């Protein structure tokens, strides 16, 4: 593990700096110079008709301004006085019997980057004090994230509009601490991907490899997954977000081992996500058709990475990926025509239907991307990130090519579009399923910093698979 990451993470999560950033964004948007920011953490939620609690996931905007993963917590930030207060639950004697003593206010003050820690029973009193003694007139909160017992009546003005936007826009550019968390998530997830690659040849079922991935992540400190992992063997990889992860790696119909396993998985480290995709040949060596598609996708990714720097238009990176895909598929004979007419007609969308990447942070599809899902151009409809890249933003770069009958068949059935696809050549590639290669990168002023070290050169992957036998 990178020791420089350990040195950064030895300090406190920079909640106070984040609170200042959000307040500054509120001012920039024209909502005033003063007031109090109010946020609630996620509540403990019980499983329906059961006495057990559901898996807990902290609200991301609350964590951004507190660094606190505790459920049932609150915070206030006095903008004018630059004072951040965390409210944590008091001791519940019944809970202590089962769960032990909770964090005390003194312990929380030592642990988190806040100015004061009080109990949640003090929230309303604290808000009233802000109005009466501090002459506070305005409170900023997020709609539908205020508990019924909380009162804003002492305030002259309550704003439910700007805080969510200000927090989400502030989260786009990461600071040194956040990048260290993302780097650690990638380090651990890389170990898990390598473990999966080494086990791929001997595994019998998709779920075996999923179990290896999750166990490796947990053993190194990622107790949670960033999202439901995708372990898609053979033609299952043609489904972009395949979820079942339970099929045998030997095809029951043909009795033959499936060609590849697409693994899209990443561990979550202290609320920050990794999102990595690799493709592994289950036999230990890519088939000729698999290798041809893999090389095109790798070219798509490498040319995309070469374009990334502060100020670049993400739509340009995405469009270039389509052009690389078109050139590659033309060379194989799957497509016919000219690059320009294929690009203008959107034929490559049949094989590359999603965006080339998205923001990454506390959420896998992180905030601030400004997607336009109503875009009538199919090349851009599912692009989760639009506009120019900012220095310090973290993005995924994940081009792919898929052989999904549900997506491709309408193109083949179209008199206008079907003529651009050679079905005889296409027939040889259905069993490839899909290939996607995904890295996580920090945008820098003149380029990028790739956080992902998982092997992606095909010879390296084949060597790892073979060495495990």
Swiss-Prot record:
- Top class in the EC scheme: hydrolase
Q: Tell me the Gene3D superfamilies matching this sequence.
A: Creatinase/methionine aminopeptidase superfamily, Creatinase/prolidase N-terminal domain
Per the UniProt entry, the Enzyme Commission number(s) are 3.4.11.9
Q: Which InterPro entries match?
A: Aminopep_P_N (IPR007865), Creatin/AminoP/Spt16_N (IPR029149), Creatinase/aminopeptidase-like (IPR036005), Pept_M24 (IPR000994), X-Pro_dipept-like (IPR052433)
Q: What does the note accompanying the cofactor annotation read? A: Binds 2 manganese ions per subunit.
**What cofactor does this one take?**
Mn(2+)
* Binding annotation for Mn(2+) 2: 264, 275, 438
Q: Which GO terms describe its biological process?
A: proteolysis
Q: Which UniProt keywords apply?
A: Aminopeptidase, Hydrolase, Manganese, Metal-binding, Metalloprotease, Protease
**Enzymatic reactions:** Release of any N-terminal amino acid, including proline, that is linked to proline, even from a dipeptide or tripeptide
What is a single molecular function from GO for this protein? metalloaminopeptidase activity
Keyword Protease among UniProt keywords: yes
Any Pfam family hit: Peptidase_M24
Entry binding sites for Mn(2+) 1: 275, 398, 438
In the record, the note on similarity to other proteins reads: Belongs to the peptidase M24B family.
| Protein purpose | Catalyzes the removal of a penultimate prolyl residue from the N-termini of peptides.
Q: What is the name of this protein?
A: Probable Xaa-Pro aminopeptidase PEPP
List the lineage, top down: Eukaryota, Fungi, Dikarya, Ascomycota, Pezizomycotina
Q: Which gene encodes it?
A: PEPP
């Amino acid at each position: 593990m990178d020791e420089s990451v350990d040195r950064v993470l030895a300090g406190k999560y920079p909640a106070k700096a984040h609170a200042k950033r959000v307040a500054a964004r509120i001012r920039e948007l024209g909502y005033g110079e003063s007031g109090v920011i109010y946020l609630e953490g996620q509540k403990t939620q019980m499983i329906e008709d059961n006495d057990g609690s559901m898996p807990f996931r902290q609200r991301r905007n609350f964590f951004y301004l507190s660094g606190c993963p505790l459920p049932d917590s609150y915070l206030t930030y006095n903008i004018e006085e630059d004072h951040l207060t965390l409210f944590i639950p008091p001791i519940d004697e019944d809970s202590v019997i089962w769960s032990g003593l909770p964090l005390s206010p003194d312990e929380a003050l030592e642990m988190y980057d806040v100015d004061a820690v009080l109990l949640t029973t003090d929230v309303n009193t604290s808000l009233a004090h802000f109005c009466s003694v501090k002459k506070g007139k305005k409170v900023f909160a997020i709609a539908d994230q205020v508990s019924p017992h909380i009162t804003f009546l002492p305030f002259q003005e309550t704003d439910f509009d700007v805080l969510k936007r200000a927090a989400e826009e502030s989260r786009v550019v990461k600071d040194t601490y956040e990048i260290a968390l993302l780097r650690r998530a990638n380090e651990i997830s890389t170990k898990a991907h390598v473990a999966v690659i080494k086990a791929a040849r001997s595994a019998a079922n998709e779920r075996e490899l999923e179990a290896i991935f999750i166990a490796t992540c947990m053993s190194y400190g990622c107790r949670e997954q960033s999202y439901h992992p995708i372990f898609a063997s053979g033609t299952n990889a043609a489904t972009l977000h395949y979820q079942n992860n339970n099929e045998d790696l030997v095809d029951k119909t043909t009795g033959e081992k499936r060609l590849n396993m697409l693994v899209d998985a990443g561990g979550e480290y202290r609320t920050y996500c990794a999102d990595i995709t690799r493709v592994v040949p289950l036999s230990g060596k890519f088939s000729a058709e698999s290798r041809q598609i893999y090389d095109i996708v790798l070219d798509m990714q490498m040319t995309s990475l070469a374009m990334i720097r502060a100020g670049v238009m993400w739509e340009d990176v995405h469009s270039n990926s389509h052009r690389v895909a078109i050139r590659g598929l033309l060379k194989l004979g799957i497509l016919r025509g000219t690059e320009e007419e294929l690009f203008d007609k959107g034929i490559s969308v049949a094989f590359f239907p999603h965006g080339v990447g998205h923001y990454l942070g506390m959420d896998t599809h992180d905030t601030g991307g400004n997607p336009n899902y109503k875009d009538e151009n199919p090349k851009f409809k599912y692009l989760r990130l639009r506009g120019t890249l900012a220095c310090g933003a973290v993005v995924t770069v994940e081009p792919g090519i898929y052989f999904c009958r549900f997506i491709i068949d309408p193109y083949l059935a179209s008199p206008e579009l079907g003529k651009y696809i050679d079905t005889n050549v296409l027939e040889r590639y259905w069993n490839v399923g899909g290939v996607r290669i995904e890295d996580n990168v920090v945008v820098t002023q003149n380029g990028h910093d790739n956080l992902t070290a998982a092997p992606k050169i095909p010879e390296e992957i084949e060597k790892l698979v073979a060495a495990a036998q």
